[in-house]
């Protein structure tokens, strides 16, 4: 199967799971097919699926990521020893672990084609990631607290693992507790990475965007917490601050070049 044939197979398989979608007309152009496939993956609950689907899905997603272009941490230049700034799609980054800004349900974003990082990571990792997260949450038995972290395989992403953390949600002014919880997100991820003997971790901008933490303050907390952790003797030697917006890139550049 080529990529187009794989995509159609995956779409039809997911439609067949949903009785209400049996008469869904599949678009003919590739971009609309991609939107439909992503949406179907986003709304699919965490239950097992057949081996053939997984084999086709894995080949398809790895092909899509390869087409976007993979960035290897080995090809990046640090701004400071052990500290990197990289602007781009975190789902195309090859390092030991990337960090997902999750919600307390911890099984991904269920809004079709939502532009949050949780949605993107679950989409390009594949349905296995939601299943793995659901197993962890079933074992835990309660929603994920803010400021902690969990680790899963990365499945079809170029990285090896995904670190999932729930950042604080800001509804008014930022409190001292909010700042401490955000710092805890970074610290918990780094501690979990060290426990698993990982060397490189890429952080997204936790709690900014959908969770409304001010970008500049969030970056200050991120940089300070990471620098403090790197003073310890652990396996973690390289940390990437991954940004998507020009605004965040400018904020991090100023912070990292100030020293």
Locations of regions flagged by a protein language model:
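Macrodomain-like recognition of ADP-ribose-binding/processing modules
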Residues: 1-259
